[in-house]
Structures are given as C-alpha cells and as structure tokens.
C-alpha cells in the first residue's frame, strides 16, 4: 500500500468470521510511524489494486474477469451477498443486505505474500515508510483470499462508497458513505494507494489554496469552493466534485427526467440525453486525465501521487523544505513554497542541489560550485577550483603543492612569491649580508672612489668565486683590507657547514683555482698580490671558511681588478644581479604584505644610482694616497702567532681615543633626541658592543646606517629568542608607547624576568636598523621590522651584568684559539637572524652601509654575535660565567662551542618543529596554531555569519570590523576613524607627507603628551653638554677635511633622498578590510605567541638617572666606566680598554632611557606658543640637524691620525688597541 492508512472498527456481525484479526478502534489505531491517529473523514484518494504492474494500467470500467464459481473455502458474511455487479464487465460483486454507516471497516485483505503480482486485479502492494514496495498480497488463486477480493471499482468518482487504506502492512476497506440495503459495495474509482490527508501535507506542489477550517490545501479555487460547500466534518467534503444543483435535482424524479435531457459534460461542454450516456462519456475523460509515469506503466488520478511515485525513480533529486516536511522535485517550486509559506526563511534555492540561501548573492556565489569553469588551478597537481579560497586551502593542506619557487638560501620550495617572501624573513641567507651591507657604494674610504651599482655588478663578474658563495657580495676597488682577514693563525673548524648546504666557497670554475702555475709561483713568492685589494693572509681565512683542501696553503687568492670606468656604462643592464628584481629585493624582509612593490623598490634603486654617482665625484682624488700606503703594507711579513708584526704592535692607538670622542658626542645627542639626529653615526653602537671600532674615523663616512653588519642582532640572551611578530601585533606594541624603539620593555606573560629589576634603567644598545627614520616611511611590514627586537633587550643587560661580565676568570690556555659555532648557520638559532623584515632597510643595507673588510664579513659578524650571546648569557646565568673566557685577539672571542652549557644548547633543540614544512616554534601552542594552516582546521566560528577562523584574534577582528562596525582608532588631526591600527598609521603617513604633522607611525595615543617646559630643559641641557664636551676636547688637532664634508653633506642628503623615495610610494589611506591578508599575517603570529598584546612598561623614573649622570660626567669625559657600580669591578676584572669604551657608551645610553617614553614627535616639537603645531616638528628637526653639523664640525678638528701614517699602521694600531688594555688613552691625553 502507498499510505499510512487509518481504519475503523470491524462490523460487529463479522467478529465470528474474522476472529483471528483483533478489533482495532480507529481512535487507537497507530499509523505507520507508531503514532495513534484520530479519525478523519476527509478521504479522497483510495487507489486501485495492483497499480505496480508493468503490463497493466487499470482503467475505470474495464472488465476484469468473467463471473466465477465461488468455492466453499471462501465464505461470505451473512449480511452480504455475491451477485452480478452493476459495473459493466466486472462480473460478480458484493451487495449489502443491511445499512452500513460511514466509518466501518472491513478487512484485512487476505492473500499470499509475493514479490510481484500475477493478476493485478486481485492484489495490493505494501509499501514502507519511504514508499518503496516491500511485498505484494496476491489473491488471484481461486482458493486464496477473502470475500474482499470480489468488491469492484466504481465506474465514476461519485459512485464509490469504500476506500482502501494500509495499516501495519495490511489492507483494509473503510466505508466513506452510507450504504443502504441492496446497494453494491464499490471502491473508489481508480482509488489511490493512500488517503488524501496523509499524502497532501508531504507533496502537493501546486495546492496553494488552504481551507481555513481544516487547513486542507487544494490545487485550484474551484476545488476549494467545492470543499467549502459542505462542513469539513462530512464525508463528501473531500470528494464532492458534483455541482450542488445536480445533487438537488437527484432528489425528485421530475428533476431526474429534466437532467436526462440536458446532461452536459463539464469537460468538453457536450450535451447528453441521459445520465448514463454522460457517465459513459466521463469515462473517456477520466482516462485522459490519468497522470502516467513516463518511466513505467503506472498511472495516477492525482498529480501529487505521480510526483511521489516518480521520486522512487530518481531519489537523488527531491528537494526538502528546511522549515517543514514537504518535498519538491523542482527547486523553483521549493523556492516559491518558502517565500509563500515561510516568511523570513532562506528563500533562494539552488536549482542544482536545492540548497537555500538568505540572499541572492549567497546563491550566486554558491552556483560557482556547480559551474564547469574552474579558473583557479594548482600549479603542481593541476587540480582546479571554482573559488580562490579553496585553492589556498588546498595548498595549505598539501605540502607538495607549495614546491614551485626555490629559496636561494635553504633550498625550500614554495608555490607563490608571497609565501617565499614570507619565508625569507625567517631564513638565513645572503640577503642578510647583501653586497651593499658590506661594501655599499657611495661609502668610499679615503683613497677609494665612490662606486655606483653598475661598478659593483662589474666586480661581481670579476670575482665569481666569492660572489657564488656570498651571493651578491662584492669587494670595492681601492680598499686596503681584504674581504677575508689576514689571519696568520687559523681556525680549522671555525665555520661548520651547518644543516643547510652551501656551494663551495671557491667553485671549480673560479679564477682562484684557475690560476696558472706561473702565476701561482709568482704570487707565492710575494707576500701580497699585485692588486691593493688583497692582503697576503687571505688564503688562510679562505681555507678556514671553505674547508676545501684543494686550495693549497701556498696558493694565494687572486681577485681580478676592477674594470675600468669605460666599461661601466655598457654593463648597467647588469643591475639585476644587484637583486633589483622583485624577488631578491623584497625577500630579505618578506615584504609581500602591503606597500612595497617591485616597481617601488626599483624606483628607489634608480634614485640611489643617480645620487651615488654624484657623491662619488668628491672622493676620486683620494685614491692614490691610500694605494701608496697599501703598497707599503705589501712589504710586511707576518708571524704565525700574531696578526701584525711586532714592530707595529708597539705603536699606540691614538685614533681609538678620537673615535671615543665622536662616540661620546653621538651618545649625548642620542640621549636627548633618540636616534633621529645623526641616525647612522657609525660608531654609535660600538659602545654597546664588546669591542670598539677597528678603524679610525678617516675610513668611515657618515651615513644613516651603522658601520657594523650586525645592527639587527642586538645583544640579547638566547633563552629569550622569539619569532618575529606580525605587523598587526607590532602595532599593538606601538600603541601607547613612544616612537623611540628603546622603551619597548615588554615581556611575555608566561615568563618571569631572568634578572632582578635594576635600580637604574637598563642599558639598551642602539640599533641603526630600528630607527624612527625607518618607522616614518614603512608600512606594517616595516614597522614589524623596527619593533620586533626591542622587547628582549632589557632582559640582557640587567642589574647584575657588570659584575658578572667583568669578573670573569682569567683566560684558560686551552681556549686560546676559540672555535665558536656561527649561530646564524644553525637552524636552531635562526630566530636571532629573522629580523630583516623591512625592504627599505634591506636596500639601505645593500647600498648605504660601509663594511671595511673582513671584520664585517658575514661569518665573522656571526662570531661576534655569538660572543654577544655568551656574554649576555653570563649576565643572566652567573654559573655560566666561568665558561666565558677572554681570548687576546682582535675579535675578542669568548668560548668554543663545546664549552657552551648543555642547558643553553638544549634550549634551542627543544623547540617544536612543524612536520609539514619544517618551521620551528618556541612553544607547543604556537606549533598547534600553525598546524591549522596545513590541516585546514578552523575551530573559531562567528556566531553571526557562521564563518570560521583558525585563530581567535582573526575572529575577534572579523566581528569587530564586519558585524559591529567598530572604528576605535581615531586620527587626532582630522577626526577620521578606522577599524584597524594599520589603517590609521597609513593615514597618518599621508598627513606626514603633506607636512601636516610628524606623527607618521607612532600611535595617536602617544602624541603631544609632553610639555614645553620639559622640552626646553632638555634643549638647554643638550647644548650645554655639547659645549662642555667640545671645550674639553678642543686640545686636539685638526681632523681630515673630507670627514667633515661627509658628515655634514652626504648624510643628510642621503637621508632626505631615502625619505622622499619612500614617501612617494605610500598607499592611499582608505581603510582596507582585507581579512584574508590579515589571516595570513596572523598565521605568522603563531611564532611569537601573545607578545604583541603585552603591556609596555617604562623605566623612566627608576633610579633617578639624571642625578647619576651629573655626578659621573667627569668620568665619562675621560672614557672611564660611568656607572659607580662598575668602578670597582673594572680594576678587578682586568678587561681590555674595549670594555672601558663599551661601558662608557652604555652609561651614556642609560641616561637616554629616561626619555624613551616620549615619542619622537613629542621630543621634536617646540614649546613656543607662536609656532603652529604642524610646523613644530619640521622646524625642530632642522634645528637638530644644524646642531649636529655644528657639533661634528667642531669635534672633527681633533687630530685623528697623522697623515704620515700608512693605512697598515692604522690596522696594526687598532689591533693592538683591541688586544692590550693599556693601549687606548683617555681623551684628555690625546
């Protein structure tokens, strides 16, 4: 059966006959779902038997069988009789002898259970709850079945009085009209398999007319009107299809006679003389009205039944309403149903799959899934996607699909340039020590012509051996020092290869190995090569670096001389080898985030070219003196136990003390004005390092970048290494803090301070990388580079640092030749190197930073970096100080790698590594969050739009910006509000470009907090100290003229050019809510944890540093250790004068910590009331620049070195000064 039918009680007089079947009252009869149902008389659609037969489609009035002989084993109840039926050709039928009332039930229908029916006239199909055929009840055999199988079907729909229904896999006949004695029992014409009321609520696509009394639906208004003619409780209300006047005329014979003459067909308007003729005609219309299945022979009177039947053929294409139990085969009907019946529901249904959406845009986006066009294709596996987000997810989850672009440093593969750039921020490589970072053009030593980028490219071709190994590193012509040191002693295992492969230091094709035997013989006989670039001991360090035995001990390295200036114009096209392409320029910082594009960087490079060509003219006439001095050096021999000859070791290092005077002046200025003034005063950082500058000032022009190749790796302890923060979190650090990078004293919430809080502000080393100059030009990527390093610095120099470092035991003889592991080549310590995150700084390192010779070689800087780490570790771990031994060499090595504490090395190795991409994380929580980028897990779901995120901060930002429409960041200049700090910063840069205000990158909450009185006091104290210092140092003689020129001219010119170049590329300040980009950035925040959200503390009022400075100013002026707490230790420790200079500048910088909480904008504004606020900072910057020029012009009049000294004497005097504690005299002695 095709219904969950309901049955009435059996007739009482049939109880003896059908005693085996218990009486089931209709009110208690459960339906197929087991729920008791109530009687309903609105029954329309009993169905014909055996409608599943494929060979037979029953037609009303068709003959089934001839009259048969009734066997004795099929008894008929006494109140019924078997005689010829009124239905034409139907044979015998059942007639009643008594009145049968509505609601009585007969049954069940008895027969054999079969899988199919032999004779469709004598059987029924039993259906399950999903309307699938379970089995058939077949009563076609003469001796099988009950008397119910002789009940015939009515010829037309108004003659029936019984309907069939299924109850628990049994068929019953129910009376739906009163049957008078002598009437035949007739089933509903073409009776459907289930009653109308059980079928209609599930499927009736076009029945949109509802009865308000019984909630029954009809296909047309006419049907509803017919239904409403009778009360809903009467049996004919559901089936009355006859006109009211027709039923009234049936009551009288006269009317019947009239009807016989005027019978009219309602379907085709034909008129018949009598009712019988009309009924015969109606049979033809009934046949035409059948709804036949186009996939099987079944036919139905109701379209809804046909639809339900067709669902069994294609079960995968029915669309269910999400708000009710109705099912539709056409999604348009489902959509119409939802709009009409369910107000406010998702009314937009997909025509392909039926999925509904609340908006048409959501449906349009969803339709792309069914589209055959998939434009987003994976480059590796060529799998295509209709949406870009799906392609990104695919690449995250499949590591193999990210291997397209190879990292030049570590060999790791990536699928996109942006992912490669992001990786390069964390990767060790040549771009951390790019050519300009060590031999920047325009930075010419005395006697060295300034070079543009083209000439440096020429040198790259001239020296392929070193160029292949160190990438873009070049050696400028005219330098009197080698690219590798003149080591007469060597470190056999000084530079292990590490985990990442590098090409051989001197490839087989290199001119080093390609020298002829004659050339080798000649060069081995001479201590020096013919070109002044090379010193004789170059071969030793090359052997130590490369560890290639093929380079013989007696084979010096030959580097081809610089090509003539005539060749340069023809090789300008080789600029691309200077990493001017997008990948090479941007990758050192991973600047794929916002503002810096390849064209931006190229424009910077081009502008730098023109600038350096002009600056280079002023040094060309200085070439010959230095070359002559270099030729004198070529005659010197070197011992195996000292770098320099004994005669040179006897000289005094006068130039070292003069360097100290310049450093002191820079420290005074830096203390008051941050690091904005003479940003790159090259010796500014030396005081914070364990050694002084190795070269006198005549070698160093004044540029805005530090001389040293390790400004990014400030002194900080190993246990505090962290991954770089994302720009988003960096901005949180900026908020409420000053623009000076030195007050970022945040520490992680879950970490305790490793040292006691000192009574005075910790001495924080200044970094030329982290300068406000960079901040004022950068985007989020630049800001991240500037703010990353500082939170860890103050942990390094705690209150106990001085005693721990200076009271080290005497050096052990076994450690005389230290062999430190270059940390930057060990992936465990790669975090310390991941700080070149600024494309601007990468360019400045390449093209603006001078790097004299081997001292600033990348690997040697790594050695010094190791020494800094060990000293820092000694300050934090007193028990480890005994391992830090001092070696009397120019490099001041501390300890061999095997002497490192085991817990120190284990600290890095216990990091957590991603098994998909190999990234290393300091904590398991960071690794867990990072793994979500590979697995696609997004546990944080938005409660408003069901969008999910892998990081909770992304969800919070999404809710704040998209749903809550919050804009908490307000510009204090124009009152414009923004949803993100980065957008506000970009907007503030636009103000700065228009000279509206100098609040480029500082947070708006940190602006304009200082008072004019404080600034005036600082101005007076600043110039007073400069005058006092210059007065003390005026006893010296004059310095070379070219230093003053470079100090006063080229520095400010270059800085201005850089600012102009970068400001021209700033983005528009329109707020971009690009959540995809922010998500990628926050994936990188996994490395740093929650450091971006930690509070910023200030050391402003700790220990009253101003009083301390006034008390110790006399000591500072004589280059002695300034803090009182260091005074006793310096005589006990026996450290060299290098440490004296370091502590001197440290004490100066301690004073600077007092001012760190004031941003640059605050410190650079006048207190005068008549100057507009917008003009204060530009005017004050100009005044500071003039003050610096005056200061340096006066200080440069001191005698730095006698002109008769050779450049080699300079080298030897410096080395002697670095090795012997008594070599450097105070400024008062100069």
From Swiss-Prot:
List the lineage, top down: Eukaryota, Metazoa, Chordata, Craniata, Vertebrata
- The molecule here is called Histone-lysine N-methyltransferase MECOM
Report residue spans for region: Disordered: 510-530, 547-618, 718-821, 990-1009, 1030-1113
UniProt xrefs under Pfam families: PRDM2_PR (PF21549), zf-C2H2 (PF00096), zf-C2H2_6 (PF13912)
Q: Where is the SET domain?
A: 78-190
Q: Which domain of life is it from?
A: Eukaryota
Phosphoserine occurs at which residues? 624, 726, 740, 1037, 1039
State the residue spans of region: Interaction with MAPK9, SMAD3 and probably SUV39H1: 189-440
Motif window: CTBP-binding motif 1: 741-745
Q: Where is this motif: Nuclear localization signal?
A: 609-622
Outline the residue ranges of the record's C2H2-type zinc fingers.
Answer: 209-236, 263-285, 291-313, 319-342, 348-370, 376-398, 405-427, 912-934, 940-963, 969-991
Catalyzed chemical reaction(s): L-lysyl(9)-[histone H3] + S-adenosyl-L-methionine = N(6)-methyl-L-lysyl(9)-[histone H3] + S-adenosyl-L-homocysteine + H(+)
Q: Which GO terms describe its molecular function?
A: DNA binding; DNA-binding transcription activator activity, RNA polymerase II-specific; DNA-binding transcription factor activity; histone H3 methyltransferase activity; histone H3K9 methyltransferase activity; histone H3K9 monomethyltransferase activity; histone H3K9me2 methyltransferase activity; protein homodimerization activity
* Entry keywords, A to Z: Acetylation, Apoptosis, Chromosomal rearrangement, Cytoplasm, Developmental protein, Differentiation, Disease variant, DNA-binding, Isopeptide bond, Metal-binding, Methyltransferase, Nucleus, Phosphoprotein, Proto-oncogene, Repeat, Transcription, Transcription regulation, Transferase, Ubl conjugation, Zinc, Zinc-finger
The reply on keyword Ubl conjugation is yes
**Which organism is this entry from?**
Homo sapiens
- Compartment(s): Nucleus; Nucleus speckle; Cytoplasm
């Amino acid at each position: 059966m095709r219904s969950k039918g309901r049955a009435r009680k059996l007739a009482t007089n049939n109880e003896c006959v059908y005693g085996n079947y218990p009486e089931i009252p209709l009110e208690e009869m459960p339906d197929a779902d087991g729920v008791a149902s109530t009687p309903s008389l609105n029954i329309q659609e009993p169905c014909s038997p055996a409608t599943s037969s494929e060979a037979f489609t029953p037609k009303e009035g068709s003959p089934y069988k001839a009259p048969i002989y009734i066997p004795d084993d099929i008894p008929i109840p006494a109140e019924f009789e078997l005689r010829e039926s009124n239905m034409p050709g139907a044979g015998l039928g059942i007639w009643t002898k008594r009145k049968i009332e509505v609601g009585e039930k007969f049954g069940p229908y008895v027969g054999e259970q079969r899988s199919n029916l032999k004779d469709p006239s004598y059987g029924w199909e039993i259906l399950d709850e999903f309307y699938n055929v379970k089995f058939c009840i077949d009563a076609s055999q003469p001796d099988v079945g009950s008397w119910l199988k002789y009940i015939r079907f009515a010829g037309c729909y108004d003659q029936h009085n019984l309907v069939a229904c299924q109850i628990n896999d049994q068929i019953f006949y129910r009376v739906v009209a009163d049957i008078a004695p002598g009437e035949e029992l007739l089933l509903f014409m073409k009776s459907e398999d289930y009653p109308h009321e059980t079928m209609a609520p599930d499927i009736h696509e076009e029945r949109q007319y509802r009865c308000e009394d019984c909630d029954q639906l009809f296909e047309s208004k006419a049907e509803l009107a017919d239904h409403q003619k009778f009360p809903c409780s009467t049996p004919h209300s559901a089936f009355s299809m006859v006109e009211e006047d027709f039923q009234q005329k049936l009551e009288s014979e006269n009317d019947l006679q009239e009807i016989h003459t005027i019978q009219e067909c309602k379907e085709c308007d034909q008129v018949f003389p009598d009712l019988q003729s009309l009924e015969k005609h109606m049979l033809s219309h009934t046949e035409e009205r059948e709804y036949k299945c186009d996939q099987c022979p079944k036919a139905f009177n109701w379209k809804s039944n046909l639809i339900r039947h067709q669902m069994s053929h294609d079960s995968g294409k029915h669309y269910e309403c999400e708000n009710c139990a109705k099912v539709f085969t056409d999604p348009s009907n489902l959509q119409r149903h939802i709009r009409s019946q369910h107000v406010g529901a998702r009314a937009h249904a997909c025509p392909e799959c039926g999925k509904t959406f609340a908006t048409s845009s959501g449906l349009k986006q969803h339709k792309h899934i069914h589209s055959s066009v998939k434009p987003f294709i994976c480059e590796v596996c060529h799998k295509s996607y209709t949406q870009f987000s799906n392609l990104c997810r695919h690449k995250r989850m499949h590591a193999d699909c990210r291997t397209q672009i190879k990292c030049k440093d570590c060999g790791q593969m990536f699928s996109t340039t942006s992912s490669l750039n992001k990786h390069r921020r964390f990767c060790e490589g040549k771009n951390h020590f790019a050519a300009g970072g060590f031999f920047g053009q325009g930075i010419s030593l005395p006697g060295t012509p300034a070079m543009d980028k083209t000439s440096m490219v020429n040198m790259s071709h001239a020296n392929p051996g070193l160029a292949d190994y160190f990438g873009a590193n070049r050696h400028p012509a005219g330098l009197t020092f080698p690219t590798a040191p003149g080591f007469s002693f060597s470190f056999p295992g000084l530079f292990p290869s590490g985990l990442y492969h590098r090409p051989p230091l001197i490839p087989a094709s290199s001119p080093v190995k390609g020298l002829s035997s004659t050339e080798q013989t000649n060069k081995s006989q001479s201590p020096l090569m013919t070109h002044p670039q090379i010193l004789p001991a170059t071969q030793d360090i090359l052997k130590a670096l490369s560890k290639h035995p093929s380079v013989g001990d007696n084979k010096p390295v030959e580097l081809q001389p610089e090509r003539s200036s005539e060749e340069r114009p023809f090789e300008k096209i080789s600029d691309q080898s200077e990493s001017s392409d997008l990948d090479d320029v941007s990758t050192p910082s991973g600047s794929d985030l916002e503002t810096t594009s390849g064209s931006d960087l190229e424009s910077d490079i081009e502008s730098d070219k023109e600038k350096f060509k002009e600056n280079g003219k002023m040094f060309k006439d200085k070439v010959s003196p230095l070359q002559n001095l270099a030729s004198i050096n070529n005659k010197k021999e070197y011992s195996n136990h000292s770098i320099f000859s004994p005669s040179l070791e006897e000289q005094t290092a006068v130039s070292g003390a003069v360097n100290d005077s310049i450093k002191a002046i820079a420290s005074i200025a830096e203390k008051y004005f941050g690091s904005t003034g003479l940003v790159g005063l090259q010796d500014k950082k030396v005081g914070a390092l364990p050694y002084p500058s190795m070269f006198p000032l005549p070698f160093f022009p004044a540029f805005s970048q530090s001389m040293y190749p390790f400004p990014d790796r400030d002194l900080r302890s190993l246990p505090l290494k962290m991954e770089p923060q994302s720009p988003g979190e960096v901005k949180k650090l900026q908020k409420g803090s000053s623009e000076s990078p030195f007050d970022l004293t945040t520490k992680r919430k879950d970490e305790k301070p490793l040292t006691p809080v000192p009574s005075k502000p910790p001495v924080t080393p200044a970094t030329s990388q982290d300068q406000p100059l960079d901040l004022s030009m950068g985007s989020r990527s630049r800001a991240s580079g500037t703010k990353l390093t500082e939170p860890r610095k103050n942990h390094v120099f705690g209150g106990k640092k001085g005693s721990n470092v200076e009271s080290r035991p005497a050096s052990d003889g076994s450690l005389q030749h230290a062999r430190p592991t270059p940390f930057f080549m060990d992936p465990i310590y790669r975090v310390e190197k991941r700080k070149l995150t600024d494309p601007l700084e990468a360019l400045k390192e390449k093209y603006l930073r001078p790097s004299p010779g081997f001292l600033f070689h990348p690997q040697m800087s790594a050695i010094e970096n190791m020494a800094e780490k060990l000293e820092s570790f000694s300050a934090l771990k007193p028990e480890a100080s005994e391992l830090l031994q001092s070696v009397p060499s120019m490099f001041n090595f501390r300890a061999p790698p095997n002497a490192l504490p085991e817990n120190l090395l284990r600290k890095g190795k216990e990091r957590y590594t991603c098994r998909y991409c190999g990234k290393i994380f300091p904590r398991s929580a960071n690794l867990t969050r990072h793994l979500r980028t590979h697995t696609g897990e997004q546990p944080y779901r938005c409660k408003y739009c069901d969008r999910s995120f892998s990081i909770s901060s992304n969800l919070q930002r999404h809710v704040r910006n998209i749903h809550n429409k919050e804009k908490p960041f307000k510009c204090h200049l124009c009152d414009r509000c923004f949803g993100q700090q980065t957008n506000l910063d970009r907007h503030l840069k636009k103000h700065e470009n228009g000279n509206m205000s100098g609040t480029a990158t500082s947070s708006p909450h940190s602006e304009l907090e200082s008072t004019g009185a404080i600034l005036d006091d600082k101005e007076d104290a600043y110039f007073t100290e400069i005058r006092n210092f210059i007065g003390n140092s005026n006893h010296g003689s004059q310095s070379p003229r070219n230093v003053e020129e470079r100090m006063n001219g080229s520095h400010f010119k270059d800085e201005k050019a850089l600012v102009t170049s970068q400001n021209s590329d700033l983005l528009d300040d329109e707020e971009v809510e690009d959540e995809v980009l922010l998500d990628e950035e926050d994936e990188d925040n996994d490395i740093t944890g929650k450091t971006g959200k930690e509070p910023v503390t200030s050391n402003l009022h700790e220990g009253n540093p101003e009083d301390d400075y006034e008390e110790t100013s006399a000591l500072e002026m004589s280059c002695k250790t300034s803090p009182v707490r260091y005074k006793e230790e310096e005589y006990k420790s026996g450290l060299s004068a290098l440490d004296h200079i370091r502590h001197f500048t440290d004490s100066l910088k301690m004073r600077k910590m007092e001012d760190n909480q004031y941003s640059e904008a605050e410190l650079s504004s006048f207190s005068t009331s008549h100057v507009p606020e917008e003009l204060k900072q530009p005017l004050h910057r100009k005044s500071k620049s003039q003050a610096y020029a005056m200061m340096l012009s006066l200080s440069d009049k001191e005698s730095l070195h006698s002109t008769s000294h050779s450049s080699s004497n300079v080298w030897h005097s410096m080395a002697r000064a670095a090795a012997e504690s008594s070599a450097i005299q105070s400024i008062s002695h100069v």
